[in-house]
């Protein structure tokens, strides 16, 4: 059983245009202590994982390769999507590439995470739950009533509900209740368990993804076959439907760096000069 860090790197960071562009999305900008968010993700998770598997796309896989090389990571797998088909398919491709008992720790490539000890504790708990056959998501304790994230309603590690991005009044209500967490977009599970649930809950995504993966050549997926895959997020496809779901309530510092405000706050926290 290997623990594999699956890095999803297909996003284009459109909310940060023109800083983030299709030719160089935000995860490849070296503006975080001289490193990119992609590099920081791979290096951070190397402490818990035996290997790295990058699911990227035809537009950015060369950037991923360069970032990994510059970070000193020589050994990795890659799957190159011909066209974006959302996260359910992207994660399915990663699961097909691994052994059924392998634990996949799925992370976006463009998140900034601090509080290393707290992060380590949460990841280790998620891996333990995954080894027991659960599908695990991470719930981040909200620092403010954020309207840009989805929320998870929890009772301990039990998931009571997933909630869409709320309006401000609803977000404030979530904060007051104390058992609502930001949906981080990070997951942990055994490859075989995920595929079993995907096949049961969204058979069309499973079958078309499998057919596409069977024709992979030198890490690259076929565009014509890829276009037949339904474009569905992993939240809708599996997380909100499976009875194997668990959540790890977490308190580490986290940001999806999805706005100029987030970058401003990061630079301010790092002590960089800020225009008044």
Identify the meaning behind each predicted range.
Residues 10-16:
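Conserved adenylation A10 loop of the ANL superfamily
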């Amino acid at each position: 059983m290997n623990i594999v860090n699956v890095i999803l790197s297909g996003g284009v960071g459109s909310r940060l245009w023109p800083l983030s562009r299709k030719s160089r999305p935000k995860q490849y900008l070296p503006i975080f202590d001289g490193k990119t968010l992609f590099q920081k993700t791979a290096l951070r998770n190397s402490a818990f994982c035996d290997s790295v598997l990058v699911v990227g796309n035809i537009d950015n896989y060369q950037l991923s390769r360069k970032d990994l090389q510059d970070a000193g990571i020589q050994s990795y797998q890659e799957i190159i999507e011909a066209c974006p088909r959302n996260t359910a398919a992207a994660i399915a491709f990663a699961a097909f590439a691994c052994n059924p008992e392998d634990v996949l720790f799925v992370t976006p490539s463009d998140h900034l995470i601090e509080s290393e000890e707290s992060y380590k504790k949460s990841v280790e708990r998620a891996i333990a739950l995954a080894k027991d056959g659960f599908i695990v998501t991470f719930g981040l304790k909200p620092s403010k009533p954020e309207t840009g994230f989805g929320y998870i309603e929890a009772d301990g590690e039990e998931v009571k509900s997933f909630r869409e991005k709320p309006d401000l009044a609803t977000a404030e209500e979530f904060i007051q209740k104390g058992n609502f967490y930001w949906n981080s977009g990070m997951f942990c599970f055994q490859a075989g368990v995920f595929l079993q649930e995907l096949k049961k809950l969204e058979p069309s995504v499973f079958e078309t993804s499998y057919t596409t993966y069977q024709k992979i050549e030198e890490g690259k997926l076929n565009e014509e076959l890829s276009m037949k895959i339904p474009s569905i997020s992993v939240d809708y496809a599996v997380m909100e439907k499976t009875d194997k779901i668990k959540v790890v309530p977490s308190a580490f510092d986290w940001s999806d760096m999805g706005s100029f405000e987030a970058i401003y706050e990061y630079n301010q926290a790092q002590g960089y000069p800020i225009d008044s």
